[in-house]
Design a protein with these regions (language model features):
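N-terminal amphipathic/basic-hydrophobic helices that include classical n-h-c signal peptides
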Residues: 1-30
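Accessory terminal helices/loops
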Residues: 19, 26-39, 130, 225-238, ...
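Conserved beta-strand hairpin/beta-sheet module of binuclear metal-dependent hydrolase folds
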Residues: 33-97, 187-200
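Core dinuclear metal-dependent hydrolase active-site scaffold
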Residues: 40-43, 54, 162-192, 232
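Active-site HxH/HxHxD metal-binding segment of metal-dependent hydrolases
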Residues: 63, 70-171, 194-195, 264
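Active-site metal-binding loops of divalent metal-dependent hydrolases
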Residues: 68-70, 106, 130-131, 180-181, ...
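Histidine-centered catalytic micro-motifs
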Residues: 101-111, 175-184, 240-246
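Active-site-adjacent loop/tail segments of enzyme domains
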Residues: 208-234
Length: 325
């Protein structure tokens, strides 16, 4: 694939427009227009505190879906597509066509609906090229079936750092921002000089801090450098979160700005040096339990949202490696 030219960044544009959709308790979408044609819908999954996005070029109606959720009941071992179906309904409402089904990384706290969305809506599944590292580590941990490829081929496109792509007429760029996992990517999208970055699990809202760094292949020092790269964008750049944990019981928030993160992020505001951050992050990570859904999530997500291959009885099974995490 040819790489798109890196878009220019202009700062003399009016502020973003944002408004909340009206609806019942299950209508948690938020809508934002950035620049002239960058439309962002945010969908909050209360069960996993995950925020999924529909990002659309209003001119061409072409869109990308970012970090979707496949609902999973660990007690019953059952999946459900209710969260993903909300995305499908919104795509239909907007009369949009799906170009991309993007994953910022192999999530450890929710299952991805990428395979289901591609089946229903089309589009190309994409993730960072370092997915192969994650597949090798977790393919071994779960003793994956011989047919499980560790080359990222479950995804349609493996994005390299600084690789450009388009969503309709919108310029987008992949940024390798490892630390939480070795394969984490952020997605920068620009329109009319306004910049939006979908940061995955690097930063959280300023009152919650940063992502953990105790998974295989994770590294706190690497995360610090990735975050500083994100915070090098202009002050007014919008940063879109992948999770919000509602500290103190506040309302859900799904975006912040570079300026707000620099000024008040409790873990990595301006003035916190690399060694201090690493010491804090490593000490904090020692106190954290594993995510409730890490074992099912990783097995599904390293396969681009597909369940493990069915066994001879036609049933897919998830494994529990004992005493390994």
């Amino acid at each position: 694939r040819k790489r798109a030219a890196k878009p220019g960044m202009h700062l003399d544009k009016p502020p973003v427009t944002a408004y909340a959709l009206q609806g019942g308790a299950d209508k948690l979408e938020n809508v934002m227009i950035i620049g002239n044609n960058l439309h962002v819908d945010a969908f909050y999954d209360e069960a996993t505190s995950t925020i999924s996005y529909l990002v659309m070029d209003r001119e061409t109606r072409q869109c990308a879906l970012i970090d979707s959720v496949l609902d999973y009941d660990p007690k019953a071992g059952r999946t459900c597509t209710a969260s993903a179906d909300r995305l499908i309904e919104r795509v239909t409402e907007l009369n949009a066509s799906v170009r991309w089904v993007l994953e910022t990384h192999v999530h450890a706290d929710h299952l991805s609906a990428a395979a289901y969305l591609k089946e229903k809506l089309g589009g190309h599944t994409a993730i960072g090229a370092h997915i192969t590292q994650v597949q090798k580590v977790f393919g071994a941990l779960f003793n994956a079936e011989p047919g499980f490829a560790r080359d990222g081929s479950q995804f349609d496109v493996l994005l390299e750092d600084e690789e450009g792509f388009r969503i309709g007429n919108l310029h987008a760029r992949a940024m390798h921002t490892p630390g939480h996992t070795p394969a984490c990517m952020s997605f920068m999208i620009e329109d009319a000089g306004e910049i939006a970055v979908f940061v995955g699990d690097t930063l959280f809202m300023p009152d919650y801090g940063t992502a953990r760094c105790d998974f295989p292949g994770a590294d706190a020092r690497t995360l610090y450098r990735s975050i500083r790269r994100l915070l090098a964008f202009p002050d007014q750049t919008r940063l879109f979160m992948c999770h919000d944990y509602l500290p103190g019981g506040r309302d859900m928030q799904y975006f912040t700005t570079v300026a707000e993160q620099r000024a008040s992020n409790i873990h990595i505001h301006q003035g916190i040096d690399e060694d201090s951050f690493v010491a804090m992050r490593e000490a904090r990570d020692k106190t954290l339990d594993m995510p409730v859904l890490i074992l099912p999530s990783v097995q599904v997500n390293m396969r681009s949202g597909q369940l493990p291959a069915p066994e001879e009885n036609g049933v897919s099974y998830l494994k529990i490696p004992l005493n390994k995490l």
